[in-house]
Amino acid sequence: MTPTLRRKLEALAERREELERLLAEPDVVADNTRFRDLSREFAQLEPIATALADETRAKADLAAAEGMRADPDLRELADEEIAAAQARLQELEQELALLLVPRDPRDDGNLFLEVRAGTGGDEAAIFAGDLFRMYARYAERQGWKVEIESDNPGEHGGYKEVVARVVGRGAFSRLKFESGTHRVQRVPATESQGRIHTSAATVAIIPEADEVDDIVINPADLRVDTFRSSGAGGQHVNKTESAIRITHVPTGVVVECQTERSQHANRDKAMKRLKAQLLDAERQRQDAAQAESRRLQVGSGDRSQRIRTYNFPQGRITDHRVEGLTLYDLPNILAGDLDPLLQRLSHEHQVDALAQLSAG
């Protein structure tokens, strides 16, 4: 471990001790908000304290085993214990390094999933539908809830565009690396010559704005249009202009919702999406500025970036952001078994973040 990382660990250990003292003070206990915030910070630092204590014990075990080597009768046993202690120390060093990676405060939150057909006409819309079902099935496996906010079905299946809210603990942390352009290579059902076509769809993963997020939307900046819904609700919604489209004039961001029966409910949902979109745009602007001075291989969230290819004839899926990340398990992945991909992407992100910490 580099001296820089070791100093960061020591500073966090000192902060945990300070928090322990603060949480015992009567004035802090009496202040519910402060007590809650400090308790949350203390809980986040607890794994580091536990790993540091384990490291101290492993170092003591190593020293004791090295001391045993002076006795010829115990040398063989000592060598075994030395090897075990060294292996344990190596594991703990890796664990501590990963614990230093800053946690994204949005990781536990919900998200908006947006899938749009790109180049490829009807085939692109069908592929967009495949991607949406893949994420919906993955969400179902995690016990999350998927609520379709708006959709525009393709003429021959799939979606020209579909927007859904994904509700579940840890949803954003799992899916946040999915933003970008997804490419498919396959023979369309309408292709009589058996030729492989290439189509694309874009995916956007936008964290839902927290209620405490500091963003003020001036009502004067909004243009609100109503229209007849073509979504859920049967004939009732088609008789009234219950659907809402909101345009944020300064940025040109447009959101709409037509899934609820009442105009008021649709407006509330649309405003939540607008807030999330504006916050996400600001985050991406800040990330772009920071990326000028540091490398971000995974997780930039750039929706123009081609991130993955789905090759149906070969049953292959290749993620272009991680060298060597190719899996020949396309049917299962499309059925919602995304963890083999997502875990590799998360690990790569941690490695990148750790490299930045070491450099700093």
From Swiss-Prot:
SMART domains for this protein: PCRF (SM00937)
Region (Disordered): 281-310
Modified residues (N5-methylglutamine): 235
InterPro entries, sorted: PCRF (IPR005139), Pep_chain_release_fac_I (IPR000352), Pep_chain_release_fac_I_sf (IPR045853), Prokaryotic/Mito_RF (IPR050057), RF-1 (IPR004373)
Keyword Transmembrane tagged: no
Keywords: Cytoplasm, Methylation, Protein biosynthesis
Main localization (coarse): cytoplasm
Function field: Peptide chain release factor 1 directs the termination of translation in response to the peptide chain termination codons UAG and UAA.
Stated name of the protein: Peptide chain release factor 1
Organism: Stenotrophomonas maltophilia (strain R551-3)
Lineage of the species this protein comes from: Bacteria, Pseudomonadati, Pseudomonadota, Gammaproteobacteria, Lysobacterales
Gene name, Swiss-Prot/TrEMBL: prfA
